[in-house]
Swiss-Prot record:
NCBIfam families given in the database record: minE, PRK00296.1
Entry superkingdom: Bacteria
Protein keywords: Cell cycle, Cell division
Pfam families in UniProt: MinE
SUPFAM superfamilies in the record: Cell division protein MinE topological specificity domain
Protein biosynthesis listed as a keyword: no
Function as written in the Swiss-Prot or TrEMBL entry: Prevents the cell division inhibition by proteins MinC and MinD at internal division sites while permitting inhibition at polar sites. This ensures cell division at the proper site by restricting the formation of a division septum at the midpoint of the long axis of the cell.
S-S bonds: none
Protein name: Cell division topological specificity factor
GO biological process: cell division; regulation of division septum assembly
InterPro entries: MinE, MinE_sf
Family designation: Belongs to the MinE family.
Length: 83
C-alpha cells in the first residue's frame, strides 16, 4: 500500500502546483488591471466621441493600450478607419 500512496501523493502535489501556477497568473492579471488609471475608460469614451463626430467607427475597431515604463506612460490608440 505504501507504493500506491506514494503515487497518489505525487498527483496531489502536481495538482497543487498547477493550481498555484494558475492562481499566480490570475493575481498577475488582476495587478496589471489595477495599474491603469481610473480615468482611462472615461478618456477612451471621450476620444471615441470626438472621432465619431468625423468618422463612423465601431468600438471593435479601436484598440487602446497603456504601457508604463519607469520614466513615462504611453497611451496608444489604434483605430481602423473606413475607406
Amino acid at each position: 500500500m505504501s507504493i500506491f500512496n506514494y503515487f497518489l501523493k505525487k498527483e496531489k502535489k502536481s495538482s497543487a502546483s498547477l493550481a498555484k501556477e494558475r492562481l499566480q497568473i490570475i493575481v498577475a492579471h488582476e495587478r496589471s488591471k489595477r495599474q491603469q488609471p481610473d480615468y482611462l475608460p472615461l478618456m477612451q469614451k471621450e476620444i471615441m466621441d470626438v472621432i465619431r463626430k468625423y468618422v463612423n467607427i465601431d468600438e471593435e475597431q479601436v484598440i487602446v493600450q497603456l504601457d508604463n515604463n519607469e520614466d513615462c506612460s504611453v497611451l496608444e490608440l489604434n483605430i481602423t478607419l473606413p475607406e
